Design a protein with these regions (language model features):
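N-terminal carbohydrate-binding accessory modules
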Residues: 1-19
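Redox-cofactor binding/interface segments in oxidoreductases and associated redox assembly factors
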Residues: 25-28, 124
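Active-site-adjacent loop and "lid" segments of alpha/beta metabolic enzymes
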Residues: 11-12, 18, 35-52, 68-93, ...
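Conserved Motif II region of HX4D acyltransferases
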Residues: 194
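N-terminal glycine-rich anion-binding loops that anchor highly charged ligand groups
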Residues: 18-26, 54-64
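Enzymes and membrane/adaptor proteins characterized by extended Gly/Ser/Thr/Asp/Glu-rich
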Residues: 31-33
Length: 285
């Protein structure tokens, strides 16, 4: 029988058990996310989307106000905060007590979300690279912190990404980040390999092929491949056509040790988790 490190994160003073994979539902309060179906701008849109995420079984809502798609428009911290306030006020009004993560690379934005709205997790696509104050802020706030690997920035990350040794470079990146965070006293660190961020389609599949090797860190692993170009560039079509491919890769990710799936399509992901867990539990007998 396969043994696996039991992983927990401290969420608002309660332990979230990751021995059963969790689903994180995406709430984009942006006008320019790469997947048009995920853009929520009006109050009614946000209310409907947050209700859908919860009703379909996600345990975390990931709210983001800064589009990280390739060549995304850069917005000011003030505009990012304005968009987030709108979404967080609605979440707290209609779904108090639900677990919320904020997708931001800015320390001041993270502080506002945690201190003013009770956000439980910080999800940083830049792992501190785009704001030198972020690591210190995370240590001060004492919340779980998701660090993602990205080569470059959202504005330039897909301009001919290159690696001499993809896996070695990604692992070294995480090793250095984790050590710095540990030195600052950060306890709950979650790794995100960063599919689609500064990587070609081939890079993404190489990374997926070695996903189980991230278990060496003995840290929770988040995978976000929902409707990304690594799917529709291979199969043809657009993000609208990429749900089946997403489900296939989510399944592979779970079999290779993913603890959290970050997705647009919550119901499909929850069902995927349920089936994979059933298979794993049946194999134990």
């Amino acid at each position: 029988m396969e043994t696996k490190t039991v992983k927990y994160i401290n969420v608002n003073g309660k332990l979230m058990d990751l021995s059963h994979p969790q689903v994180m539902g995406i709430l984009n309060v942006t006008p320019d996310s790469f997947y048009a179906g995920s853009r929520q701008q009006t109050e009614k849109d946000i209310i409907n989307r947050t209700s859908q995420i919860i009703e379909e079984g996600a345990s975390i809502i990931d709210i983001g106000a800064y589009s990280s798609r390739p060549n995304a428009e850069h917005i000011s911290p003030e505009e990012e905060m304005r968009r987030l306030r709108t979404g967080l006020e609605i979440i707290n009004r209609y779904h108090p007590g639900c677990v919320v993560s904020v997708d931001t690379f800015r320390a001041d934005v993270a502080r506002m979300c945690v201190e003013e709205y009770g956000v439980a997790i910080i999800n940083d696509i830049a792992a501190g690279e785009m704001d030198p104050q972020m690591f210190d802020m995370v240590a001060r706030l004492g919340v779980p912190y998701i660090i993602m690997h990205m080569q470059g920035t959202p504005q330039n990350m897909q301009m001919n990404p290159h690696y001499d040794n993809l896996l070695k470079e990604v692992f070294l990146y995480f090793s250095e980040k984790v050590q710095k965070l540990r030195d600052l006293g950060v306890k709950d660190i979650i790794l995100d390999p960063g599919f689609g961020f500064g990587k070609t389609v081939e890079h993404n599949y190489q990374l997926m092929n070695h996903l189980e090797e991230f278990s060496l860190f003995e840290l929770p692993l988040l995978v976000g491949i929902s409707r990304k170009s690594m799917i529709y560039k291979l199969l043809g079509g657009t993000p609208d056509d990429a749900l089946n491919g997403t489900t296939v890769l989510d399944t592979i990710s779970l079999l290779k040790g993913a603890d959290i799936l970050r997705v647009h399509d919550v119901k499909a992901a929850v069902e995927t988790v349920k089936i994979v867990q059933k298979m794993k539990n049946s194999a134990a007998f």
